[in-house]
Amino acid sequence: MVLRRSRRIAILSSLLGLFLLYHFVSFRPELYSRTYDAAAAAAAADPSECPDLPGMEDVLVVMKTGVTESLDKVPIHFKTTLRCVPNYIIFSDFEEEIEGVKIHDALRTMDSVVKDTVADFDLYNRLREQGRAGLDNSDFADEANSNIGKPNNPGWKLDKWKFLPMVQQALLHKDNAKWYVFMEADTYISWPTLLQWLAHFDPREPHYIGTETQIADVIFAHGGSGFVVSNPAMQLATNEYATRTIELNEYTDWHWAGDCVLGKVLADAGVPLHYSWPILQNSNVGELDEFAKGFYRKPWCFPAVGFHHLSKREIQDLHAFEKRRRQETDNPVLLHRDVFKELIYPELSNVRDSWDNLSDQEHPTINTFHECQILCAGSRHCAQFVIRDGICFTGETPRLGVSNPAVRSGWVLSNIDRMIDKAPRCSRPDFGV
């Protein structure tokens, strides 16, 4: 790729950027004005459906998706995570409507030179010319995630370019929001818990909050886990992008992770990341280790605000779970303790067929389920076991796991009960601040 570097082009690009900024601010229509009505209608139809969310009016929820997943993954959020949210906007690589809600093109304000010359934009340009008819089967082909993402997936290659323009457009969409909460289409956020957590931060200060991840020397918030940016930090990031557009486009082209690019921009602007783990998770419920020992924090008494890598069914189940909790308790804060006791523990049993509980301590000389069960039951430090490919694995902390027809799992409930009894009482949530 060759990006134009001459002084003349730089000046023209800057003038074009200022024109677009003026035009967008001065003449933009309401990008999505029905969210207030949707939230009010949901509350009127069923008061239990929408919890009291004081402060949510000062939050803009920003969802990022892509054309190859949006029709499948976005609609469930209209019935769950977004149902009672007064202000939200959804960005993709293709502008369209889904169930009457406008999906915005995150890349529409980007430099056309980049979009016309960078190979990553092949999918985007086909969409602009042909709409969804321009998609082919290879665009939907899944690819296993590697340590550098999915470099052969057209949608994934395009995704990194969305972050900086998305931040810019989100700020323009609601420039008076105190907080901007970014999520993806396979993310779930507990809004009551989020608001209780954010109450410990001053929105007048620049904040960048998320699950800490590192590539080279850049520490950034993992995008899929969800992350939060205050209004002053959004302004700083937008100013950086506006004044360093060519440089940052070159950096994005060289890089492979857009959330890392955003983290670098914020760091350059003097806004370091506030670490949020385990409050925001890059895991679904089945993968959670609520008794984790090997990290700098133990999840048990921390709020559980966000989950990632969720199916539509899992998002629906979490929404129903929170609705049920509202009817049973006045406490708006969901702790990891509650997730374990109320969601995970009831699913554990002595034996569970067609299930992998993700035990990872290998015992290669033990090859039968019965022997593996005896081994685990004989240790006070063993919480679970599994036979996987004819080999016994055990685990010292209980996890729910995932469906797998070729695997058989089990848990030692007496040991797990002992762990629960010894766990902290959580007299107050640990908000990590």
Q: What is the meaning of each model-derived region?
A:
Residues 56, 76-88, 95, 100:
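Short, acidic, metal-binding catalytic loop of nucleotide-sugar glycosyltransferases
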Residues 93-177:
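Active-site-proximal specificity loops/subdomain of glycosyltransferases
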Residues 60-68:
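A conserved hydrophobic helix/loop-capping motif in glycosyltransferases and polysaccharide synthases
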Residues 187-268, 272, 280, 330-339, ...:
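Conserved catalytic core of nucleotide-sugar-dependent glycosyltransferases
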Residues 2-39, 254, 260, 265-433:
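C-terminal catalytic/acceptor-binding lobe
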